[in-house]
Amino acid sequence: MLSPLPLAIKMSQQQVFEQSIQINAPATVVEQCIAERVLMHRWLNPALRCDPVGDWSTDVGSRSRFVIQVPLLQPTLESTVVEREPGLIVWEFEGFFKGRDRWECQPIEKGTRLLNRFEFEVPNPIIRWGFNTFAAALTQQDMQAQLRRLKRVAEAQLGK
């Protein structure tokens, strides 16, 4: 179940989108769905592609590129894992956005509460205006959809 009201905070130019979902699977399974690239691509927005820089890893210092697959442009976010411990992965990114994407698996009685916190700013004022005008609400909706897809992927792993 998704948290009833997604949190959206705008502090100066920094914005925070935070959402959570309850998943009926252990935190280790949920974490595996985030950390393993093949499983990640089962729930990631189909318009996004995550490419490793070097070997794929979610260890601190590991780098990757998130590419938005739109015709002609393919904007890219360069990301680095900056925090990592069991149940937690935090990517820091730069590109048209600058910020952090936090994925935290919190064990609960019947599974896991997965928290996704996207803290960012858009440095370019023209791109910021376009994002806030046209894409901010869609981004939050997509985050909710990704959490629902991740829930399905994680819960399906239990049947294997």
Predicted segments with their positions:
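Hydrophobic ligand-binding cavity/cleft-lining segments
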Residues: L2-D59, K160
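Hydrophobic-ligand binding "helix-grip"
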Residues: H41, V67-L115, E119-E121, R152, ...
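Short alpha-helix boundary/capping motifs
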Residues: S57-D59, I68, D142-Q144
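Short acidic/glycine-enriched loop/turn segments that link adjacent beta-strands
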Residues: T58-V60, K98-G99
